[in-house]
From Swiss-Prot:
The chain crosses the membrane at residues 33-53, 77-98, 113-133, 178-198, 226-246, 288-308, 320-340, 347-367. It comes from Heteromys anomalus (Caribbean spiny pocket mouse). Keywords: Electron transport, Heme, Iron, Membrane, Metal-binding, Mitochondrion, Mitochondrion inner membrane, Respiratory chain, Transmembrane, Transmembrane helix, Transport, Ubiquinone. Belongs to the cytochrome b family. This is Cytochrome b. Its cofactor is heme b. It is found in: Mitochondrion inner membrane. GO terms for biological process: mitochondrial electron transport, ubiquinol to cytochrome c. Signal peptide: none annotated. GO terms for molecular function: metal ion binding; ubiquinol-cytochrome-c reductase activity. Binds 2 heme b groups non-covalently. InterPro entries: Cyt_b/b6_C, Cyt_b/b6_C_sf, Cyt_b/b6_N, Cytb/b6-like_sf, Cytochrome_b, Cytochrome_b_C_euk/bac, Cytochrome_b_N_euk/bac, Di-haem_cyt_TM. Heme b b562 binds at residues 83, 182.
Amino acid sequence: MMIMRKTHPLAKMINHAFIDLPAPANISGWWNFGSLIGMCLIIQIATGLFLAMHYTADTLTAFSSVTHICRDVNYGWLIRNMHANGASLFFICLYLHIGRGIYYGSYLYKETWNVGILLLFTVMATAFMGYVLPWGQMSFWGATVITNLLSAIPYIGPDLVEWIWGGFSVDKATLTRFFAFHFILPFIVAALAMVHLLFLHETGSNNPLGIPSNCDKIPFHPYYTFKDLLGVMIVLTLYLSIVLFFPDILGDPDNYTPANPLNTPPHIKPEWYFLFAYAILRSIPNKLGGVIALVLSILVLALFPLLHTSNQRSMTFRPISQFLFWVLVSDLFILTWIGGQPVEPPFILIGQVASILYFLIILVLFPIAGLIENKILKW
């Protein structure tokens, strides 16, 4: 008799994706982040669903409904803190996942990579709209500033902004539609994640050496199911430590003040995971130029497969590219720091230099390093 997981139509799909999937024998802990992002998505959808049961998307009651969740709902404080910090965990895992993809040349799986970029944009949109919902000061002013950037688009810009707002300013209509979109987008993210996996399983996983691993494969279960489970337990421990001991460490104190359109906070800034892009936006004095740079800061990822000049896939044996990679990582930390600082000297200049360096490394220095390394190795 055949095993059911190999014959049943539904079980067969799960079997091919998570049980009998042939996986490279040498993939490291850096390959754990895919499953961790999946875990984050499940946590966010589950906690978000329970929050939505008690939240009201109305400008008059949104802030007090969040207060009600934290004070009066059973374990509401826990659900709210898990959801708020779950977003930070989500982006930490996403950025590490992308960094792994760049370091080990995973971007050469073009379809998987491009769906991944689409996923990043969708998750960013979801997180931005979610940040508006508590209707605190930073929620309101963040929504006002970021949506207003669209007015820089020539000809259609001003009309587009009013269309998104549903009026002449960020108000009840904006909050209601942001709640609707924030609720539906995670399910679109889940669907895109399945497409991401579908494309990945067409080619099989990459590995740290960046060479074909067809001659050395092992079944996903039990080896990588338990390896992923270890990663889940470690990350959950760190995550719950933040949630239970330091729930407000990553938030903005201004968001504990109800939204007031008549009072602007001294420093308007997004959540920490958008600060690098915000710094790039602010480093260009022109509004349209800033918006273009903001979009390109993420869209530039799509150019990685086209700019790959090395004859080796991975950076494992490429010291010049490795050096540039870690300079890029350091540069992103500097941009994140600058994004949270006021627009005044010396932060303006540091932000401009870091922004130029960001694009310079990706568009110019990485391809040149690849060619130099080919020459050194006489390939």
